[in-house]
Amino acid sequence: MENKAMYLHTVSDCDTSSICEDSFDGRSLSKLNLCEDGPCHKRRASICCTQLGSLSALKHAVLGLYLLVFLILVGIFILAVSRPRSSPDDLKALTRNVNRLNESFRDLQLRLLQAPLQADLTEQVWKVQDALQNQSDSLLALAGAVQRLEGALWGLQAQAVQTEQAVALLRDRTGQQSDTAQLELYQLQVESNSSQLLLRRHAGLLDGLARRVGILGEELADVGGVLRGLNHSLSYDVALHRTRLQDLRVLVSNASEDTRRLRLAHVGMELQLKQELAMLNAVTEDLRLKDWEHSIALRNISLAKGPPGPKGDQGDEGKEGRPGIPGLPGLRGLPGERGTPGLPGPKGDDGKLGATGPMGMRGFKGDRGPKGEKGEKGDRAGDASGVEAPMMIRLVNGSGPHEGRVEVYHDRRWGTVCDDGWDKKDGDVVCRMLGFRGVEEVYRTARFGQGTGRIWMDDVACKGTEETIFRCSFSKWGVTNCGHAEDASVTCNRH
């Protein structure tokens, strides 16, 4: 190292701009060249500061510098930990600079501690100055790295804020889309259930219409047979009447011709009768005169009966009369009554139950319905064998106790029965529970009105031999995919 003349100043000789009062930073490290550039050099160039160059003061200055750098590093680490993670390259560069700075301070401390008390102070000061100059460069590089790291941290923080905002916006949009999708799914489920109900109702109506059309077809076939018979008989009667009318027309024409001839004969006979009457009148007058004369002559003559005269000759045979008019044929008799229908054939075997369809998606929980009216007071408890059926099942909204909507009692509440798989076997069990002989008809689709409250039973499948409907096969209590538009009903046989 180049030897330089070094003049030390005393503490009292230094003014306000000396190293004694200036703040210590990386740019003022050159002030350790104490007697070279200071203002005391102008005043007293030949006097040195013997007290400032002491080794203890130098150690205290180095320790203060070390403590200051340590505090700066602690603040940098706290800032780095409290902010988002920076890039790996910047962190590696910062770590290398900190390690190098620590090693430099450690070497400096070891040198100061191991330096002899009587060594060349000037040589040691120059070494310390070079070390501090190197540390100043390292601190400047470290400050630049820290500034770059701080800029990167601020950029990362801004990006993190933007990312959080984008994530929050995406979360809100996702939540809105999820709510919208759930609402649309619920609406689709409601529409699907309504469509299924309508399809079942229309299927029932179509079945009834098909049965009515079949009955109407049979009635039309019967009417067609009757009409064909009437048409045949009427055609025969019309032909017969046409023939009779033709005969009557011929007879009328013949009768009119005979009438004309009779009229002519009558006119001639009338003239002849007039002439004969005139002649008869004249003869009668002559006979009257002669009779008067004879009567006078015969008064004096006694009358005596003479012998019979001879038999006269046989008269001529009269002309043969005309044949009479043929009589009209009698009317055709009415067709006989329709025969009685034959005995009905034996009832066919019931078909096999179809396979159970897949269970649909469970719908959303509906709103709680209004509180129902207070039910009627039940009968007093008694023998279980005689009270179980009336207390556990009833028929509602019918014209009498023999018909209505089927309701069962469970969990201290009345509920309805779904009509899925509802048939006469199930109705027989219900009617026997109520004391009737059997079922007359079973109904679906809420024939006697829709119920309220829970639907306790669904997919009921009785064999027809059970004592109660609760021994039949059905889904669990309250487990159903039906609505009250599918409540089951029965009409029991009262006879």
Curated annotation (Swiss-Prot):
Q: Which cysteines are joined by disulfide bonds?
A: 418-482, 431-492, 462-472
Outline which residue ranges sit on the Extracellular face.
82-495
- Coiled-coil segments, which residues? 91-111
Where would I find the SRCR domain in this sequence? 393-493
PROSITE patterns given for it?
SRCR_1 (PS00420), SRCR_2 (PS50287)
Q: Which GO terms describe its cellular component?
A: cell surface; plasma membrane
Which portions of the chain have biased composition (kind: Low complexity)? 323-341
Q: Where is the Collagen-like domain?
A: 305-357
Which region ranges are annotated with the description Disordered? Answer: 301-386
So where does this one cross the membrane? 61-81
Tell whether tRNA processing is among the UniProt keywords: no
Top-level taxon of the source organism:
Eukaryota
- List the Cytoplasmic topological domains: 1-60
Location in the cell: Cell membrane
Keywords on record: Cell membrane, Coiled coil, Disulfide bond, Glycoprotein, Ion transport, Iron, Iron transport, Membrane, Receptor, Signal-anchor, Transmembrane, Transmembrane helix, Transport
What is a single molecular function from GO for this protein? ferritin receptor activity
Q: Is the keyword Coiled coil in the record? A: yes
Q: Where is the composition biased (Basic and acidic residues)?
A: 313-322, 364-382
- Listed InterPro entries: Collagen, SCARA5, SRCR, SRCR-like_dom_sf
Which sites carry carbohydrate?
Answer: 102, 134, 193, 231, 254, 397
- Role: Ferritin receptor that mediates non-transferrin-dependent delivery of iron. Mediates cellular uptake of ferritin-bound iron by stimulating ferritin endocytosis from the cell surface with consequent iron delivery within the cell. Delivery of iron to cells by ferritin is required for the development of specific cell types, suggesting the existence of cell type-specific mechanisms of iron traffic in organogenesis, which alternatively utilize transferrin or non-transferrin iron delivery pathways. Ferritin mediates iron uptake in capsule cells of the developing kidney.
Assembly and partners are described as: Homotrimer.
**What is the name attached to this protein's record?**
Scavenger receptor class A member 5
The record lists the lineage as:
Eukaryota, Metazoa, Chordata, Craniata, Vertebrata
